[in-house]
Amino acid sequence: MQLADGSVAMAHAPGMELGGVCVAGARVLLSRNAAGGTTKTAFAIQLVAADGGCWVGAHPSLGNRLAAAALQRGLLAAALGPHVSARAEATHGRMRVDFELADAAGARTLVEVKNVVCSDYARGSRAPRPKGYELVYSPHEDGPSYRRAAVFPVGKLGQKLEDGTKCVSERAVKHVRELAALAADSGGAVKARAVMRCCGAARRTHSRAQAAVVFVVNRGDCHSVSVRRSSCPALAVEAPRAAAGGVAFHAFRVRWAGSQAHFDGLLPTDV
């Protein structure tokens, strides 16, 4: 990595090659790793300027922190409802969810979170990608009507489910299945939403719950978020099945201005 002063340093790129958005020659914003930590590099990549110049919050931990900040400020109330408390990594039965929210009446909302960094492209367009990453093209017409959509997940089909089905993220498929099971067992007693992990104390819970998923679209150039069969067939099967069973899917967009993140509203989802 060539720094602004011309020197060269090693930087860690976490999260499965940052979703394929970090390519040779890309501009990045770095954070300095703490001395004496477990990482072997002095820096970690936090933001990447994707093709077109849009800053992407590609580091996985950014999504968690942004979701926590949005919840603390009440910015997700339109999707998740108002709440008076938020507990992170709460255990519900055999599943540990990212958030457990509670409203003034004691009704709970269970929340799981997914960070979204990749987008689709107009058909016929080209952009560099690391080996093994393919562009996901829009299913809609090109031209002035094209509106970029965020896509989750994007990556190599290098993981497998228990039945041997290949997928991009076994963890994501597992979470959607678990949320669907919660929704099936809920009986409408408790709301459950999936948004993104943040820090905080864990708490064991046992009540039944419904379920939902909220994607954090960590780039400001997308107008919706989609689970595409062309990027991960396994999740493209499980997500609509979960939605039909009562799992709600929500999304919000983050727009970056340098190192500052701005909440940029809720987005429609397509599962």
Where are these regions (language model features)?
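Terminal, basic amphipathic appendages of nucleotide-handling enzymes
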Residues: 22-24, 28-73
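A short acidic/basic microdomain associated with nuclease active sites
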Residues: 75-94, 98-100
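Metal-dependent nuclease catalytic cores in nucleic-acid-processing enzymes
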Residues: 28, 173-192, 199-211, 243
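Conserved catalytic cores of phosphodiester-cleaving nucleases, focusing on short active-site segments
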Residues: 97-161, 165, 179
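N-terminal targeting/trafficking signals and adjacent low-complexity tails
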Residues: 191-193, 199-200, 210-211, 218-271
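Conserved RecA-like P-loop NTPase helicase motor core
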Residues: 166-170
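Beta-strand/loop nucleic-acid-binding surfaces
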Residues: 6-22
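SH3/SH3-like beta-barrel fold
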Residues: 1-3
